[in-house]
């Protein structure tokens, strides 16, 4: 029992240290990794009929999408990509809420595929510094 709590404490410190020293681009990458991890876990919990695990994982994914990825976008922007991402994130949240209510693994997998495409595009853009704009 004590060892598990100690391990969790060290893991939490490691995450906090990584966040504190990360660039904005690395933070967004961490958000993508976190939401994808939560979605994979939600699918597995749904397949195992683990309602509590499913709920916790879907809540985490929704929280990251709404309070991490979506709020980092400028909703007042007229940029088409920004507006499309805002709409897509809203769609993903709706699908995850439906997945939770209906125990619909395919909805979680749909959101995971969409998110993986966005995450892959983001990570690819990091390899081309000319594609990354500095925040204003």
UniProtKB/Swiss-Prot annotation:
InterPro entries: FliS (IPR003713), FliS_sf (IPR036584)
A Pfam family per the record: FliS
Keywords, in A-Z order: Bacterial flagellum biogenesis, Chaperone, Cytoplasm
Subcellular location: Cytoplasm, Cytosol
Main location: cytoplasm
Gene Ontology BP terms: bacterial-type flagellum assembly; bacterial-type flagellum-dependent cell motility
Domain of life: Bacteria
GO cellular component labels: cytosol
The keyword Flavoprotein belongs to this UniProt entry's keyword annotation: no
Similarity-based family: Belongs to the FliS family.
Name of the protein: Flagellar secretion chaperone FliS
Originating species: Escherichia coli (strain K12)
The gene coding this protein: fliS
């Amino acid at each position: 029992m004590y060892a598990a709590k100690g391990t969790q404490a060290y893991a939490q410190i490691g995450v906090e240290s990584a966040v504190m020293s990360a660039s904005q681009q690395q933070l967004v990458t961490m958000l993508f990794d976190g939401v994808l991890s939560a979605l994979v876990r939600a699918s597995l919990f749904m397949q195992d009929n683990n309602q509590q695990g499913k709920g916790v994982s879907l809540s985490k994914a929704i929280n990251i999408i709404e309070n991490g990825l979506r709020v980092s976008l400028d909703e007042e922007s007229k940029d088409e990509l920004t507006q499309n991402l805002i709409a897509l994130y809203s769609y993903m949240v709706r699908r995850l809420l439906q997945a939770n209510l209906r125990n619909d693994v395919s909805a979680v997998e749909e959101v995971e595929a969409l998110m993986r495409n966005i995450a892959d595009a983001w990570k690819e853009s990091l390899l081309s510094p000319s594609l990354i704009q500095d925040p204003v």
